[in-house]
Curated annotation (Swiss-Prot):
Gene: rimO
NCBIfam families: 30S ribosomal protein S12 methylthiotransferase RimO, MiaB/RimO family radical SAM methylthiotransferase
Family: Belongs to the methylthiotransferase family. RimO subfamily.
Start and end residues of each MTTase N-terminal domain: 5-115
Function, as annotated: Catalyzes the methylthiolation of an aspartic acid residue of ribosomal protein uS12.
Protein name as annotated: Ribosomal protein uS12 methylthiotransferase RimO
Enzyme Commission identifier(s): 2.8.4.4
Catalytic activity, as annotated: L-aspartate(89)-[ribosomal protein uS12]-hydrogen + (sulfur carrier)-SH + AH2 + 2 S-adenosyl-L-methionine = 3-methylsulfanyl-L-aspartate(89)-[ribosomal protein uS12]-hydrogen + (sulfur carrier)-H + 5'-deoxyadenosine + L-methionine + A + S-adenosyl-L-homocysteine + 2 H(+)
Organism: Francisella tularensis subsp. novicida (strain U112)
Domain Radical SAM core, first and last residues per copy: 132-369
InterPro entries: Elp3/MiaA/NifB-like_rSAM (IPR006638), Methylthiotransferase (IPR005839), Methylthiotransferase_CS (IPR020612), Methylthiotransferase_N (IPR013848), Methylthiotransferase_N_sf (IPR038135), NA-bd_OB-fold (IPR012340), Ribosomal_uS12_MeSTrfase_RimO (IPR005840), rSAM (IPR007197)
Subcellular location field: Cytoplasm
Length: 439
């Protein structure tokens, strides 16, 4: 009897890395490998690493060490794979190291260290591939890499320049996901609004219709699938204005994830971020005029080198004026290889924490005030989880992305016969800082 090699797999980092993991696992399953969820039951372990922040590097190295201790045969891939010397210095026992998207060499290493009898196992793999997210939503990666040169970021060094997929290729994947039961698509990349620039907006045919490989045509085509489609990592370029009418028409979700990072012109200049505070505010107001129920999410960095008290006050003032719906904020931390590491006027950890607390305190109040408008309304939600012991469900409205935004806590889940991955209409009875309560 032929023994099927068992592979343990760990995926670290961002949603983009998760999509890479799905592709690797799909390839392994197609070749007949068995994927297991424990180190000790595996013939070998693959760790798909993150190498962006120093904290992520530390986590990746720690997980590699755990896999070596519990299994002994470990392959490392992903963003930290670009720092092979660091990995080898810390963990010389690692069998193979490959970088992000280096699928061919990774699979070759798998063949070397856990060979499998040649056969055709493609029938074991569903048409949409193997997904690591819950069945009802999926990330849809439309490009790799980035053409921006932000001083706090090393993504272009890790993943290279922008490499867009053709629109017909993306739409074929999106259609497979829909046919597999996916209800929500989360469109991701490093810079979603730059999609297609590198391939000169190459045209493609889908459903007997010609589309250009740009974000407007892509959003239009995805809207025709009649799914929840959510856009992430959208820079506030002028052409984004053309997407918002699609939201007002109900073609795609009224949700924009726009990573602004700061508002102070001086800080943005040092970050090498394209932005102008008043233009950004004007654009936000314009979006709300076109689509009044649009939800705008953003992320910010406090404590960037040289950030003065005046710069921070500028950010607080911007937050008051912008009244953003969903906000994440991080304390600046050095990323090995980033240009910002060379900057003077570093901010102390104590001041960074104070600014983070003050900024998020303000945003918590803004969120509290904005969520109160939902009380007494009926909202469609998608169910993410059900707690049978305590008889409640966790869902999300169209205004909330999974993992990063708020939730709707729904009582009497069993009596309502709520099911994970299905839609339900609920009445909102209460609101908190970030979540809604429904009876």
């Amino acid at each position: 009897m032929i023994k099927i090699p068992k592979i343990g797999f760990v995926s670290l980092g961002c949603p983009k890395n998760l999509v890479d993991s799905e592709r690797i696992i799909t390839k392994l399953k197609a070749e007949g490998y068995d994927l297991v969820d424990s180190y000790d039951n595996a013939d070998m372990v693959i760790v798909n690493t993150c190498g962006f922040l120093n904290s992520a590097i530390d986590e990746s190295l720690e997980v590699i060490g755990e896999a070596i201790a519990e299994n002994g045969k470990v392959l490392v891939t992903g963003c930290l794979g670009n720092k092979a010397d660091l990995i080898k210095e810390k963990h010389p026992e690692v069998l193979s190291i490959t970088g992000p998207q280096d699928y061919e060499n990774l699979i070759e290493a798998v063949h070397t260290h856990a060979p499998i009898f040649a056969n055709d196992f493609v029938s074991l793999v569903p048409p949409q591939g193997i997904k690591l997210t819950p069945r009802h939503y999926s990330y849809l990666k439309i490009s790799e890499g980035c053409n921006n040169t932000c001083t706090f970021c090393i993504i272009p060094d890790i993943r290279g320049k922008l490499k867009s997929r053709s629109i017909d290729n993306i739409m074929k994947e999106a259609e497979k996901l829909k046919n597999a039961g996916v209800k929500e698509l989360l469109v991701i990349s490093q810079d979603t609004s730059a999609y297609g620039v590198d391939i000169k907006y190459k045209s493609g045919i889908w459903n007997n219709k010609e589309y250009q490989s740009n974000i407007i045509d892509l959003a239009t085509a995805l809207g025709d699938l009649d799914m929840w489609t959510r856009l992430h990592y959208v820079y506030p370029y002028p052409h984004v204005d053309k997407i918002v009418p699609l939201m007002a028409q109900g073609k795609i979700l009224p949700y924009l994830d726009v990573p602004l990072q700061h508002s102070s012109p001086e800080v943005l200049k040092r970050m090498k971020r394209p932005a102008h505070t008043q233009k950004t505010l004007d654009r936000i107001n314009k979006w709300r005029d076109i689509c009044p129920d649009i939800t705008i999410r953003s992320t910010f960095i406090v404590g960037f080198p040289g950030e003065t008290e005046a710069d921070f006050e500028h950010l607080l003032d911007f937050a008051e004026k912008a009244q953003l719906d969903r906000v994440g904020c991080f304390k600046y931390s050095e990323v090995e290889g980033a240009k910002a590491n060379q900057f003077d006027n570093l901010i102390s950890e104590e001041v960074k924490q104070q600014r983070l607390d003050e900024f998020m305190g303000l945003q918590a109040q803004i969120s509290t005030d904005k969520l109160q408008r939902f009380v007494g309304t009926e909202q469609q939600v998608i169910i993410d989880a059900i707690n049978k012991d305590e008889n409640y469900a966790i869902g999300r409205t169209k205004y909330d992305a999974p993992e990063v935004d708020g939730q709707v806590i729904i009582g009497d889940a069993l009596e309502r016969n709520l099911k994970v991955g299905e839609f339900a209409t609920v009445e909102i009875t209460e609101s908190t800082e970030y979540d809604l309560i429904a009876d």
